[in-house]
A protein has these predicted regions:
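Short linear motifs in intrinsically disordered
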Residues: 42-46, 96-98, 170-174
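Short beta-strand-initiation
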Residues: 49-51, 95, 101-102, 177
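Intrinsically disordered, low-complexity regions enriched in small/polar residues
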Residues: 9, 33, 54, 58, ...
Length: 266
């Protein structure tokens, strides 16, 4: 979960250089307009599953090893598309993932165990003259920055816990490749490949000990939240441009998930 995605020009937040910097929150999320998949942490699954398809994918492979397993809320049907923004650039969903909410702040790893707070200088809400200050008169973090640090710290901790869950999920070998296809009456279609989803048939072969362990830890609930969230794929397709004005009898066909056996996506 180290990808920056929505961040354009990150710099270390310096109490000397940025002593007078203020932030005026913007009422839009245009910074995420080109993000078709938003990283999630496991604690978000129950909320996110109500509105987003939760899917898995692999990061870049290292040598002959599979890439790290990651989890995302799917927000578009192709790269560079976010269907959860309205015409004014506002996030159009009840639940906004923490990855989005923490912007324009982010932790950057500057050492083996050292994290440094950074900001995206391109964020239009930063200003020296108006907004809430990041630092107080003594140069200490002001209320806004303290709140941002709390969110960053919690997200980092949850990301580590999520990583441990994903390693278990990967080792259990219960994932399969899948692709999402939405067909429209005018001949258009959307196809998303490289996704991984849990194979319910494979879950039946898990040992009783594993099932009991995952039940006790809450990880089994995460898997079922993921499976239930796949019902949002059709709702995602209906957010595509033009679908809202299509007459009801000719609405896009239900999004289908075509599944292929296999442990990793390409």
């Amino acid at each position: 979960m180290t990808t920056l995605l929505i961040y354009q020009d990150t710099v270390v937040l310096d109490r000397g250089l940025h002593r007078r910097l203020k932030l005026k929150p913007q009422d839009n999320a245009r910074f995420a307009a080109a993000t078709h998949a938003v990283p999630l942490v496991a604690v978000e699954f129950s909320e996110a599953a109500r509105e987003y398809p939760i899917v898995f994918a692999r990061g870049a492979a290292e040598g002959d090893k599979h890439g790290e397993l990651l989890c995302y809320a799917l927000t578009g049907t192709c790269e560079g598309e976010n269907l959860y923004l309205d015409a004014a650039g506002r996030w159009n969903a009840d639940y906004i993932p923490a990855f989005i909410r923490r912007y324009p702040f982010v932790f950057a790893q500057t050492g083996a165990d050292q994290l440094t707070v950074c900001i995206d200088e391109t964020y239009p809400g930063f200003d020296d003259n108006s907004g809430e200050p990041l630092f107080d008169e003594a140069g200490e973090p002001a209320a806004l920055l303290r709140s941002a640090l709390e969110l960053l710290t919690d997200f980092q901790r949850q990301a580590q816990l999520t990583g441990a869950f994903l390693k278990k999920l990967d080792a259990a070998d219960i994932l399969m490749e899948a692709q999402m296809r939405a067909d429209f009456p005018d001949g258009r279609h959307a196809l998303v490949q490289g996704l991984l989803v849990v194979d319910e048939a494979k879950m039946k072969h898990l040992s009783s000990a594993t099932v009991q362990e995952w039940l006790a830890s809450g990880e089994l609930g995460l898997i079922y939240a993921h499976l239930l969230s796949l019902g949002n794929l059709s709702r995602l397709a209906q957010r595509m441009p033009g679908s809202a004005v299509t007459p009801a009898p000719e609405a896009p066909s239900a999004t289908t998930m075509k599944k292929r056996k296999g442990k990793g996506a390409t």
